[in-house]
Amino acid sequence: MILTITLNPCVDNTFWVDDWDSLPVKTERQSGGKGINVARVLTNLSVPCLALAPAGGENGALLRELCQSERVPLVPYPIRGETRDVDTWVRRRDLEQRVDVHPSPEMTREECAGFEDLALSLLDRARAVAVCGSACCERAAQAGRRILEAAKERGVFTVLDSNKTALAVCSEAKPDLIKPNQKELAQLMGRDVAPEEEEEACEALLDRGIGSVLLSMGAGGAVFRSRGSQPVRAAAPRVETVNAVGSGDSFLAAWLHAWTAGASSRRALEWACAAGAANAAVFPAARVTRREIQEQAGFSL
């Protein structure tokens, strides 16, 4: 089983409009947050998984309902704060988007301790744990770090796919795999990273004690780097991009699927790039299927 940890879940609301000053002609909702997205795609790929996330208020109840309807195996941890909304407005004629991210809830010290305890109780059943996305607060980021540290002590494969405060804090746990995009790689390095410097930056992360680096570059493909091996590169299939949101989550889910299947580093990277491209070609986010990935990859796992 793969356990995903979403430190800042949301209800994703998509409003389709004819123009920015017009009322929506269609509204769509789905569960959101990077770990939840990863779990949705893992489920589509028949990989056993659980998605642990804090959930509070009316939106927390809605999140649980949405996950149930989407077959996302959510393990909700109740908190007093209100789970956030993320509103995306899409103009139908050209698919241009505007996004409004609502405030995140705070988690109390007691809530974070309970969340950690629940995560640790699930680790005994896990082959891998992936801490994903932003953190709703500093305490939640620290909880994510401690969960990764505890998982490493138990021999569970640890993955970090995060940003901002959560990336800075959780990377201190030196996970077995970190999956930055180019912006997050720059954050980790504390400076801009030119394309010709990316492999050197990945090597620097390995020198810090991180086990391996999976650098996703969107349409530019991806690089996998681990200690004692040559970098592996894969190109991204060419698609007409409709919606890039969720492509990184689909990428990671497909890589984890390949990892559980024992695929080679190259095959896993190609499968992951195909999943990211398949997601970018469709609405809504992070719902790609094995068939859609296979069509982009030209092979199946």
What are these regions (language model features)?
Residues M1-L52, G60-E65:
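Glycine-rich phosphate/adenosyl-contacting loop at the front of the ribokinase-like
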Residues W20-D21, N44-R127, E295-L301:
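Conserved N-terminal subdomain of the carbohydrate kinase-like
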Residues V17-D18, V90, V223-R227:
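Short beta-strand-to-turn element immediately C-terminal to the catalytic PLP-Schiff-base lysine
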Residues A141-S229:
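Conserved phosphate/ATP/ADP-binding segment of small-molecule kinases
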Residues I2, V47-L50, L74, T158, ...:
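Hydrophobic anchor at the start of a short beta-strand
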Residues A168, E196-L301:
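Conserved phosphate-binding/catalytic region of the ribokinase-like
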Residues M1-L3, Q97, R127-A128, S212:
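Structural motif
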Residues L123-C137:
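Short acidic, glycine-rich surface-loop motifs adjacent to enzyme active sites
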